[in-house]
Structure formats: C-alpha cells, structure tokens
Amino acid sequence: MADFSPHHSLLLKATAAGAAIATTNDPNISSFFLYNHSHGSQAPQPANAAAAAIVEDASLESSVSAVLDTSPSVDRKRKAAEDSAHSKDSCKDGKSRRGKKASKEVEEKSTTEDEPPKGYIHVRARRGQATDSHSLAERVRRERISERMRMLQALVPGCDKVTGKALILDEIINYVQSLQNQVEFLSMRIASMSPVLYGFGMDSDGLHDQKIGGMFQEALAMPNPVLNQSSPAPSQAIMDTTSTTSYSLQSQHGAISFSQDNGSYLMQAVGEPRQQEMLNQLVFNNMCSFQ
C-alpha cells in the first residue's frame, strides 16, 4: 500500500474509463489508454480530453441515430397520405361507376315501360278499373249502356238538365207513365162515343172499312145542298180508317159529316140541340170518370 503514490488514483480512474470505452472498438483510443497505463502519471490531462471527445462522439452518434430514426416516420406519413389519397380516388371512382349503373338501369326500365310488349293490347286504365279481358268487355258494355241512356235522355223533354243515372231513369219513367195515361184517356174517349153511333142508327160494326166506304158512296149520290148543311155546335170523334175523301151524311135527326186527315176520320154530328147537349154531357162524364 505504501508503494502507491497519489497519482495511482488517477491511473485507476483512467483504467476504469479505458475499460468503459473499450466497447467502442476504437484502436486509437485503446492504444492511447494502454500508453497511459504503461507510463503512469506522465500524461493525465490528455486522458481527460480524450474522455470529453468520447462523450462528444457518443452525443453525435445519438443525434445521428435520432435523425435516422425520425426519417422512417416521415416516410411512413408520406405513404399513409398517399394511401389515403388513393383510397379517396378509388371511392370516388366507385361512386361514379355506381351512379352510372343506376342511371343506366333507370333508363332501361323507362324504355321497357314505355314500349308495350308485342301481341298485347296496351290499355291505360283509370282509377278503379282493371286491364284484363273480362274488365275490358265490361267497360265496352257500360259504354253501350251509357249511349242508350243518352238517347233516352234526348227523347224525354227537359231531361238534359238532369245529372245522375237514377234521376234520369226517374224522369224517363214519369214521362212514359204520362204517355200511358194519355193513351188510356183517348181510348176511353173513343169507347164513350160508341153509344152515339148507336143513336144515329149505325151498327157497332160500322167502324169497319167496308161499311164506312159504302156509307160514303151513298153520301156522294146525294144532292149538293144537303152536303153543304152545317151546325154551330158540333161534336167530334176519331176513328182509324184508310179512306182519303171527305163525306157528309144526313139522317132523320140531322146531318153527319166525315172528313179524313192522315188516315183518321173526324165525325161531326149535326142535329137537334137536345141531342147535342146529351152528347156533350156524356163526353164530359167520361172525362171526369177517367180523371
């Protein structure tokens, strides 16, 4: 222990530093430390300078390694940005393609809907109407019925202003009933005139064409003054015949004149006032009983 001088402590420190730096594999530094170890305390100051230089080299290496470590991160960021840009472009392309496909499909559907298939009658149905064959036949039948209704509506006076099939049918029924009543009234009036024919000595079968024609021929054989007789209060009756001339007859109680208009005979009975009053009363009673 007495052999060591105060400089031996520096040598020990130098040897320790040399052992620590030996891992750097620098031949110059190792030779320098070996030189210091061999010469002892002759150069302690250069050893401290070498240690400082080693520390600076280590800091430089650490900074270089840090720079080298940061460079891959920048590359990664660039790659990520490029990948995101590519992904956005691909998404846009995909959307555009999908939009084009959808537009093409819509156009194809519209063309197929506009063009009806061959061998099929295209009918645009209204609301509540079908397009099958049965429904088409039903539509045709209803159109024919509506045409007939319009014809009936034109025949009935005052029916053009009525709207609705039910109301139109009611108007037509009322009009037909009124016509039926008029026909019945006329038939009753003609039937009421048959006793008048009996009163003048005429047979009930005298309404036939042959007998009336014979009476007209007899009337033609009479002189003109008799044919021209007239009366201020005539009574009339209608009888259907086929003759086309006008005649005048004379009986015991007065004169009877016949005239024809479009296939119908008009009879005028000219006689005493009493018979005329009875005839008018009979016609009036028949009219009242009918009403």
From Swiss-Prot:
Pfam families: HLH. Residues 129-179 form the bHLH domain. Plants expressing BCL1 in the lamina joint and the spikelet under the control of BUL1 promoter exhibit increased leaf angle and grain length. GO terms for molecular function: DNA-binding transcription factor activity; protein dimerization activity. Residues 80-117 have a biased composition (Basic and acidic residues). A motif (Nuclear localization signal) lies at residues 125-132. GO terms for cellular component: nucleus. Mostly expressed in panicles and stems and, at low levels, in leaves, lamina joints and roots. One of its GO terms (biological process) is regulation of unidimensional cell growth. PROSITE patterns: BHLH. Residues 65-120 are annotated as: Disordered. The keyword Transcription regulation applies. Residues 129-142 are annotated as: Basic motif. InterPro entries: bHLH_dom (IPR011598), bHLH_ZIP_TF (IPR024097), HLH_DNA-bd_sf (IPR036638). Keywords: Gibberellin signaling pathway, Nucleus, Transcription, Transcription regulation. Residues 143-179 are annotated as: Helix-loop-helix motif. It is found in: Nucleus. Belongs to the bHLH protein family. Homodimer. Interacts with IBH1, BC1 and LO9-177. Together with BCL2, positive regulator of cell elongation at least partially through increased gibberellic acid (GA) biosynthesis. This is Basic helix-loop-helix protein 80. It comes from Oryza sativa subsp. japonica (Rice).
